[in-house]
Amino acid sequence: MARIAGINIPDQKHTVIALTAIFGIGKTRSQAICVAAGIAEHVKISELSEEQIEKLRDEVAKYVVEGDLRREVTLSIKRLMDLGTYRGLRHRRGLPVRGQRTKTNARTRKGPRKPIKK
């Protein structure tokens, strides 16, 4: 298995699909990385030479991925909560942030129903 950005990339998948195993890299970005590295998208990771894998590592290093991206997202949510914005309050209360209804639905965000104590 090739190791890129601290993640073991699946060997038996095509390059474009395998790169999406890295947090922060979707299909479009992985296609751009393959083009920049000069690697065909349909080639499997196991068929790449060490030199080509090194090119992929260099291209992936240009983006914010994995731990740095997770930290950035967490800090931006924390910043919203510290500022006391509406979005921050919704995050703090564990409610939907983007205007969805909450009278019914929103169970994923709110968690399981809490029984009413009598």
UniProtKB/Swiss-Prot annotation:
UniProt keyword RNA-binding, yes or no: yes
GO cellular component terms, semicolon-separated: cytosol; small ribosomal subunit
GO BP terms, alphabetized: translation
Residue span of region Disordered: 92-118
GO molecular function list: rRNA binding; structural constituent of ribosome; tRNA binding
Superkingdom of the organism of origin: Bacteria
Pfam families: Ribosomal_S13
Keyword DNA repair: no
InterPro entries named among the record's database cross-references: Rbsml_uS13_C, Ribosomal_uS13, Ribosomal_uS13-like_H2TH, Ribosomal_uS13_bac-type, Ribosomal_uS13_CS
Entry-linked PROSITE patterns: RIBOSOMAL_S13_1 (PS00646), RIBOSOMAL_S13_2 (PS50159)
Keywords of this entry: Ribonucleoprotein, Ribosomal protein, RNA-binding, rRNA-binding, tRNA-binding
Cited function: Located at the top of the head of the 30S subunit, it contacts several helices of the 16S rRNA. In the 70S ribosome it contacts the 23S rRNA (bridge B1a) and protein L5 of the 50S subunit (bridge B1b), connecting the 2 subunits; these bridges are implicated in subunit movement. Contacts the tRNAs in the A and P-sites.
Quaternary state and interactors: Part of the 30S ribosomal subunit. Forms a loose heterodimer with protein S19. Forms two bridges to the 50S subunit in the 70S ribosome.
Protein name: Small ribosomal subunit protein uS13
Native source species: Yersinia pestis
